[in-house]
């Protein structure tokens, strides 16, 4: 992943243009954009292609970043997959459940690493890789891997990690929609032996069981922060995936995690990570 070229799907839109420009200035190797209506034009001195296939064939890109409206995402993502893209980072939010189930099916079938939807993306400071919308003001090279479902809390953790001179080795927003595409085992096959990472901070919340996949992991030191302890039952809090219910009660989750790892009472305790 660290040396692959990147296709920006949605580069020609205002949102995609803005964040693609920031990523390029940061040092990310984005080489092309995608828009069949504007094929042959240049944006940020990058060629715009009519299809993922042409972009992959000509530029040899293996990663795509998705900035397009949610109702177009399914077709573009499946086109990415068939064209040979291996890693897809989806910033778009509110992809329908039906579309996400189809996307997950194709990602599993073709062994694709999919991050999102409704994700701030991924940033790797040492390699100057920014795939998404992360603010770079507080990004500094360090040894803390921040893994989060909440974009806003990720940004706060980044700011506090800089303040406490921890820095970041890698920051990942897994996505806030009800169905996310991330395969944890596949993601860690790429990054678990990432030498720059000393500690992992997992920012969990209500409405998710993804934290449970880390309970018996021992290769790196892991710390948790779980938000939403006072949230009411059966109420969406913040985004569509954050729902506290009797099948995934947050207090039961915290009790289970405490058996294995330290849980921070709030993110200001990030200075406990050493």
Question: What feature does the model see in each segment?
Answer:
Residues 1-274:
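Catalytic-core regions of core metabolic enzymes
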């Amino acid at each position: 992943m660290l040396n692959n070229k990147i296709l920006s799907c949605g580069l020609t839109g205002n949102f995609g243009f803005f964040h693609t420009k920031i990523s390029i200035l940061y040092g990310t190797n984005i080489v092309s954009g995608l828009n069949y209506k504007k094929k042959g034009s240049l944006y940020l001195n990058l060629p715009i292609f009519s299809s993922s296939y042409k972009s992959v064939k000509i530029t040899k890109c293996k990663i795509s970043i998705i900035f397009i409206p949610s109702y177009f995402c399914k077709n573009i993502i499946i086109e990415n997959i068939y064209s040979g893209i291996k890693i897809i980072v989806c910033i778009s939010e509110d992809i329908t459940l039906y579309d996400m189930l189809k996307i997950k099916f194709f990602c599993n079938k073709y062994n694709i690493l999919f991050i999102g939807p409704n994700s701030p993306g991924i940033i790797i400071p040492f390699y100057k890789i920014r795939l998404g919308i992360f603010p770079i003001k507080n990004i500094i090279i360090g040894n803390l891997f921040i893994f989060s479902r909440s974009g806003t809390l990720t940004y706060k953790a980044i700011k506090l990690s800089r303040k406490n001179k921890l820095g970041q080795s890698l920051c990942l927003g897994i996505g806030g929609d009800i169905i996310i595409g991330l395969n944890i085992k596949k993601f860690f096959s790429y990054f678990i032996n990432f030498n720059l990472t000393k500690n992992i901070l997992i920012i969990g919340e209500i409405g998710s069981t993804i934290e449970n996949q880390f309970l018996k992991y021992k290769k790196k030191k892991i710390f948790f922060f779980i938000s939403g302890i006072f949230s009411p039952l059966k109420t969406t809090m913040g985004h569509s995936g954050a729902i506290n219910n009797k099948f995934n009660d947050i207090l039961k989750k915290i009790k289970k995690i405490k058996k294995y790892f330290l849980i921070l009472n709030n993110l200001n305790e990030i200075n406990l990570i050493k």
